[in-house]
Amino acid sequence: MLLLRWPTFCCLWVFGLGQLEQTELSVTRETDESAQISCIVSLPYFSNTAIHWYRQKAKKFEYLIYVSTNYNQRPLGGKNKKIEASKDFQTSTSTLKINYLKKEDEATYYCAVWI
């Protein structure tokens, strides 16, 4: 079983302009399954905001992917089949999907907004 963790409140340092919330504390899945992590974004301009996803393993942060206004994901490092991101404009939520889970996917995952 693989354990994916993330904090309840995520990294948005905008001095009261908004909030990011990841409501689940952990997700456990079997190897080769998929896992989804959601991030609720409380910003007045969600539709125009790029949501960025990171993971932390052994005190090292890794940038994974971002999703912008037009639902297009912008992966780095050729991970577009392994890692996907999407936005739901009705619920102001971004979702990270990790496919084909492996032991090395165990990490703490973060969503972020650059202001």
Curated annotation (Swiss-Prot):
Region of interest (V segment), residue spans: 19-115
Keyword Phosphoprotein: no
SMART domains documented for this protein: IGv
One GO BP: adaptive immune response
Signal sequence region: 1-18
Keyword Transcription applies: no
Protein name: T-cell receptor gamma chain V region V108B
Species the sequence originates in: Mus musculus (Mouse)
